[in-house]
Amino acid sequence: MKEAVLSGKSITKAFGENTVLHGIDLDIYAGDFTVIMGSSGSGKSTLLYSLSGMDRLSGGQVFYQEQDIANASENELTKLRAGNFGFVFQRTHLISNLTLGENIQMAGLIGNLSDKETKMRTDELIERMKLEKAKDRLPSQVSGGEAQRAAVARAVINKPVILFADEPTGALNKANSEEVLNLISSLNAEGQSVLLVTHDREAALRGNRILYLEDGVIIGELDLPVYEGKDKTREEKLSVWLEGLGW
């Protein structure tokens, strides 16, 4: 039986009179690559932010290691996220006056790593993300793909339990998207739990568990084998499933 590393119970989120999430129950399992799909405005990103404690709930609970993070203080949430959650967004949010290497290193220094561990981990990730030539450049001096690979490195330098990724390839061309997705898939293959929000089928195919959100409610779930490369059967299963949901 799979172990749930994060559990949402009756998650409800409203902005004023507009209810975006309607009592969602959702477990995120250790080692899974979970994907949340849905049309624009369905509540995908809001669900990710609610599960990670970045958005306060209007109702419900979210448990991480038996702690109800939905009702935790900001100080408690900051400490919890620093060592347990990593985040990648469509925009990289890299610090503009720091090099890519410094951006990665800073995340380790403010996390749970010693100076020595931070240096070793930074060097390891720069090599893994193929950033050797770009590490000493500012974000404005590199390509979108290089910047996003640095953002992935920054997100995982503290070896988080869960990597939250909100449309990480949304602003990238096909080649750069493929590169970033390959990196996230390789991390998942080593046991990294991933929660990815996307509207892109190519990105969704990386998941082994795909959820479809419509009007703030999960209306479908598809289980796939662990991703091992492009596979026509996998693509057909996803297409048939999405067509059945009216995508």
Segments from the language model and where they lie:
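Conserved signature/switch motifs of ABC ATPase nucleotide-binding domains
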Residues: 137-140, 157-158, 190
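Short coil-to-helix segment of the ABC ATPase nucleotide-binding domain corresponding to the Q-loop/switch region
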Residues: 98-107
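Helix-to-loop junction immediately C-terminal to a conserved catalytic motif
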Residues: 52
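Conserved ABC transporter NBD signature motif
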Residues: 60-68
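Conserved ABC ATPase "signature" region
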Residues: 68, 105, 116-133
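Conserved ABC ATPase signature
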Residues: 138-142, 146-148
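Catalytic Walker B motif of ABC-type/P-loop ATPase nucleotide-binding domains
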Residues: 163-166
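ABC ATPase C-loop
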Residues: 131, 135, 155-156
